[in-house]
Amino acid sequence: MKIKKYFPLIFGFSIVIIIFVILAMNKGPKAILFYGDTCPHCKNVDEFMNANKTREKIAFKKLEVYNNQSNAQLLTQTAKNCGLDTSAGVGVPLFYNGDTCLMGDQDIINYFKQQ
């Protein structure tokens, strides 16, 4: 009997908890900069970001792909989602801003300049 009495309260509380968890999971930056640790074009982007304090202006994750297989797989999936041809692999740097993919140091630097 007590279970029936408290069920709506427990159910409602559970729904609120689930909503908070979902919102917390979606709070992080959606933008991602994929790079390789020995990539010279990636170094150009990194130098620009450091000189212009880009990380203070734009929230994004940096994911290294040469030494991290799961990051490399995410890079490939992201490129596919952007409609890029991945049959010959995907080059870095690649910046995904949540909507589109920008590939190559100059396109990424130009995007950062506009922000």
Where are the predicted features?
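Non-catalytic, surface beta->alpha helical segment in thiol-disulfide oxidoreductase systems
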Residues: G91-Q115
